Amino acid sequence: MSAKAIKFNHHAREKMLKGVNILADSVKVTLGPKGRNVVIAQKYSRPIITKDGVTVAKEIELIDPFENMGAQLTKEVAFQASDSAGDGTTTATVLTQAIVNEGVNAISANMNPIDLKKGIDKCLHYALLELNLLSQNCDNLEKAEQIATISANGEEQIGKLIAQAMERIGTDGVVSVEDAQGYDDELIFKEGLAFDRGYLSPYFINNHEKSTVELNNPSILLLDDKLTHMEDLLPLLEKLANNRNPLLVIAEDINNEVLSRIIGNNMKNNLKVTVIKSPAFGSRRTEILQDLAIYTGGTVISPEIGMDLSEVDTDKLGNASKIIITDSNTTIVHGEGDPQLIMQRIKQLNSQLLNSSSEYDQKKLAERVAKLSGAIAIIKVGAATEVAMKEKKDRVEDALHATKAAIKEGIVPGGGVAYIRIAQTLASLEGDNPDQSFGIKILLKAMESPLKQIAKNAGNEPVEVLSTIKKQTGNFGFDAKNDRYGDMMEFGIIDPTKVTRCALEFAASIASLILTTEVMVADMEDNNANHANHDHAHSLNCSH
């Protein structure tokens, strides 16, 4: 038996609002080039000092379960922004807080939450259309460097390294961030081929700190078929029994029983076998398997050309110096294929690319060329202490994701200016009724909040800065770092369109969810289980 505390309508929203504000107030101080630090206590180590919004959000859990729901929903906005665009977490949090506060006030004034949500949704739709019109291509190294520098909280060295990495390997290449041995940052390149397929079971993980599978000097079986019977694989495993090098099997699909037996064998035998699914589907999968075969010096085993897995010898296997597998990605480092055959394959793919009339096919062929010829970039991050190292690596990861997003989806003027221009354009937008129109105004007003917070964190008067920018047009904005006004594009203060879009989308979505919440249910503490809360909470006994 467990007692539940329940809150209804405005009592629920007020508690949730308090949680939203506690989390947002903790996160938003980090926004902008003069964002403040947040110090986070660690139970068994030194405190973390960070200016990374999502790092702060992760640490916040509130004692009051109802307030905590508001905090956790706001935290979800930061996580979604981070996962989708790699940056914009603090902006998304600031937007959410602004929408929720205005919305709760409107509901308290007897406005309809559903109509408010419809107004917010309508405004969001048109705001995203305007954002696309504002967006420009990120088509040169200088712009990429500016994006990376801004996302790394103004560290120009990090911006340079990320831009150089992007120039060399492109947006589809692999960039990893690692600890440096000393204090200096550096960029190094290694050969490698990566594709979007991860391990099929956590039991394959052998680097538990990074939650990855790392195979040194592995053999590689490329199977253009489903692996449905363990007996088909056993003859090859017997031939490799005395080989201490691991085996990676890449197959179209793997039967669950076969997967279980492989995991069981790994626990008993010296030969460690890892299985992943082939990248892509259909004929494209067959072509990519052939790319992998050429890159690793192996042969694709396919029943369509009369090859039987049970008769495969070890000379058909590919090889590499290392393979790293995450939950979603596999990277083959230093495949042992013939360099001349690899170059011939690249020329063949480039020829297909030139002759293709399909935009989709061109994109996929270009990706394959990049992967066959591309390198893996490694950014080594240096710092004086372990705490500083972790904080810096977080910023490099953010900057890396933001730069990739900018190259793929374009850029807009930064510093909150894009939102201001969109809000000005949509100032006359109306809903189907007064409450919907007010919902539109809620989102338009919320779009002013990132710029105001950037100005506040820089020690300026937010209303004054906002007023000055509204009197101008286009890219005119406020450079908080250097305390000046002017063209944000010329200043190099730019944001990825994707980051700007995702922050607004996720903030509007979660805020609307909070505003349309009427009931909250939480576990009641034992010492309160027999008492009703004085603020209209009710207890409900539930048996499990």
UniProtKB/Swiss-Prot annotation:
InterPro entries: Cpn60/GroEL, Cpn60/GroEL/TCP-1, GroEL-like_apical_dom_sf, GROEL-like_equatorial_sf, TCP-1-like_intermed_sf. It holds the Pfam family Cpn60_TCP1. ATP binds at residues 30-33, 51, 87-91, 415, 495. It is found in: Cytoplasm. Transmembrane segments: none annotated. Keywords: ATP-binding, Chaperone, Cytoplasm, Isomerase, Nucleotide-binding. It comes from the Bacteria. The keyword Cytoplasm applies. The keyword Disulfide bond does not apply. Its EC number is 5.6.1.7. HAMAP family: CH60 (MF_00600). Belongs to the chaperonin (HSP60) family. Together with its co-chaperonin GroES, plays an essential role in assisting protein folding. The GroEL-GroES system forms a nano-cage that allows encapsulation of the non-native substrate proteins and provides a physical environment optimized to promote and accelerate protein folding. NCBIfam families: GroEL, PRK00013.1, PRK12849.1, PRK12850.1, PRK12851.1. This is Chaperonin GroEL 3. It comes from Psychromonas ingrahamii (strain DSM 17664 / CCUG 51855 / 37). The gene is groEL3.
